[in-house]
A protein has these predicted regions:
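Catalytic pocket-lining loop regions of alpha/beta-barrel enzymes
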Residues: 4-8, 116, 142-298
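Mid-to-C-terminal alpha-helical segments outside catalytic/metal-binding sites
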Residues: 2-17, 24-81, 110-118, 139-143, ...
């Protein structure tokens, strides 16, 4: 399915790959099971801090549902297109029975499709699936790619208590490959009490979950079995791309542990994954470009809670070339999503 391309600039379309939405009914259904709607008093914050946090959450939640405000923000940021994804931090349903979870994900995807249809020049949808049940996930993936016209789906870092590389997940990955779907991997957040204080679930837990998810996909042979997969990892891939030397050392010294791999972990990182630019530190972005290549990175703001000037963040780099900046700002995302530019 073709998709219209809008350009604010005359040269390239600027595409934000990391932009969240919320469906209120699904959020209410998930309340109590997700990290973002857990009781803030459990974090040992002061009463003043709790009030400030509640105000911050309410403000950003409004931005996830008010599309007129979203479009205004996009124009101010210089963003032509947002890739809309359901916020798994707010409305994670993998804990539910598969049939119930499927209904919630269908509702989410229907609402997302309606939002995209209102302004298809500005929005592209990536749906959500009940990943804890691969047969149900495949069913909804096929609907997303067919009936709803999405470009792919967003998933969390685990399928509830099942790792992404688990043998039971192989049919799902086979379906993703068959349909040519793009998968955006964004953790739903660690709810373990150890990560509650100081919102460590976000600052420490999210990149840790991304590293674990990628490791599972690499070491369990998913990337080897389906090299054509298009998987983009949020937050610059978490910790893994920045610590690949240790992975490679273990691969060299303990080959008997890595029987489903034909190349080093760092090679999979460079050749089999994509990453968004949501790193909040230009030095880290430049390092990521050096290690995996500029052609593997897409711009991501983490709207509405992340980088307020995602275009400037990339443009301000002194080490990334202008052509590589153009690729990161939009051309790579267009290629990944199959858009004509």
């Amino acid at each position: 399915m073709s998709h219209p391309i809008r350009r604010i600039s005359k040269s390239i379309p600027v595409i934000d790959f990391h932009a969240h939405t919320v469906v209120q009914e699904v959020r209410e259904f998930s309340k109590g099971h997700v990290v973002q709607t857990s009781d803030p008093k459990n974090s040992s914050m002061s009463e003043e801090a709790i009030k400030s946090m509640e105000t911050w959450i309410a403000s950003n939640r409004r931005k996830m549902t008010d599309y007129s405000e979203r479009l205004k923000d996009m124009d101010e940021m210089g963003v032509d297109i947002q890739v809309l994804t359901p916020s798994l931090v707010h409305q994670y349903t993998y804990w539910a029975e598969p049939e119930i979870s499927l209904k919630m994900e269908q509702l989410t995807n229907n609402c997302l499709a309606e939002s995209v249809a209102v302004n298809p020049e500005r929005f592209i949808g990536l749906g959500s699936v009940p990943l804890q049940s691969p047969p149900h996930a495949i069913q909804e993936l096929e609907r997303c790619m067919g009936e709803l016209g999405f470009k792919g789906v967003e998933i969390s870092s685990t399928a509830e208590h099942m790792e992404l590389g688990d043998a039971k997940m192989k049919p799902f990955w086979a379906a993703v490959a068959r349909l040519g779907a793009t998968v955006y991997l964004h953790p739903s957040g660690i709810t373990d009490a150890r990560y509650v204080r100081h919102q460590l679930w976000n600052s420490v837990g999210q990149p840790l979950e991304e590293a674990m998810a990628m490791s599972s996909l690499i070491y369990e042979g998913v990337m080897e079995a389906f090299p054509q997969l298009k998987i983009c990892i949020a937050h610059g891939g978490g910790y893994l791309p920045f610590y690949a030397g240790r992975l490679d050392r273990n691969y060299r010294e303990k080959p008997f542990l890595h029987t489903q791999m034909t190349k080093s972990p760092s090679d999979y990182l460079k050749e089999n994954f994509w990453y968004d630019s949501c790193l909040y530190n230009v030095d880290m972005l430049e390092y990521l470009v050096e290690k995996v290549g500029s052609d593997r990175i897409v711009m991501g703001s983490d709207y509405p809670v992340g980088e307020s000037d995602p275009v400037g963040f990339i443009r301000d780099s002194q080490k990334i070339s202008d052509s590589d900046k153009d690729a990161i700002l939009g051309l790579n995302a267009a290629k990944l999503l199959g858009l004509s530019v």
